[in-house]
Amino acid sequence: RSEYSARLVFLSYNWIGGIQGAAAATVLAQGVAALGIIIYTYRRRPELRWHHEDMCFDRTCLKEIASFSTLTCIQQSVMNLGILMVQGLVNSFGTAVMAAFAAAVKIDSFAYMPVQEFGNAFSTFIAQNFGAGRYDRIHRGVRSAFVTAVVFSLLVSVLVFVFAEPLMLIFVRPDETEIIAVGMAYLRIEGAFYCGIGILFLLYGYYRAIRMPGMSVVLTVLSLGTRVVLSYWLASMPEVGVTGIWWSIPIGWLIADVVGIWCYRYVKGVRGS
């Protein structure tokens, strides 16, 4: 994304050092990305420009937007709360595990970012056809999107599994062998199940598009709830340890996938999509 590119530029120049520099780079990158989007939209999408006659209050639209945004806020809050709880557990295993987790999560997020954005585009496609009543196109689009997401996720899984060590070396010095080993274990466990999160992103997008955002919240709670509960349970076993945290993440994805697909079959029958 443009935000991440700008952040890398600001960080590479290192105008402000340390944590303050990273924080400043993040804020500046977000501002640059927002400004770029505004300029692009104004120049290339005249239909989205504001005009005086558009400045009116619509109570129905406000109510609809508020209902959707509230559920989205709940979804994001649950997601971040779960991540914080897992991060707290990871921190209890010491600095080496903390450093490995921090580096591996960045690689992990970058690896599945394309399928996440694909899920957003998929949501737009479904919403347009749902509004137009084109359920036949929705059905074909769902099949095509799932195949595409699975194939892409499998490809990325292979790349991350094979190149786990070189990827860790982007963030870690070669002599920090413990951090590299822990990070590689994380990447290879998560990477083997990228299909799970790829499908989950499609399910999030699908339920938002057909005006069932509450289902996206349910899937998020299932995924993150499973991750948190299993993380604390498995990590408490001496024979499992920190590896249990890594395994809890894809297990959460897969459980949410099963529930989401089961509900999709029901919704498909009811709505004809």
PLM features per residue range, with description:
Residues S2, L35, S77-L81, F110, ...:
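Hydrophobic/aromatic residues within the transmembrane alpha-helices of Major Facilitator Superfamily
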Residues S5-Y13, I38, L84, G88, ...:
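Alpha-helical transmembrane segments of multipass membrane proteins
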Residues F10, N14-T70, I126-F193, A235-S273:
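Short alpha-helical transmembrane segments in multi-pass integral membrane proteins
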Residues G18-I19, A96-V97, P213-M215, G241-V242:
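Membrane-helix interface segments
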Residues A100-A164, I197-L219:
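Small-residue-rich hydrophobic transmembrane alpha-helices
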Residues R7-G17, S77-K106, F110, Q128, ...:
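Helix-terminus/linker motif at the lipid-water interface of multi-pass membrane proteins
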Residues A29-A33, I37, T41, R59-A121:
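Transmembrane helical elements of multi-pass membrane transporters/channels
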Residues E3-Y4, I170, T226-R227:
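Alpha-helical transmembrane segments of compact multi-pass small-molecule transporters, enriched
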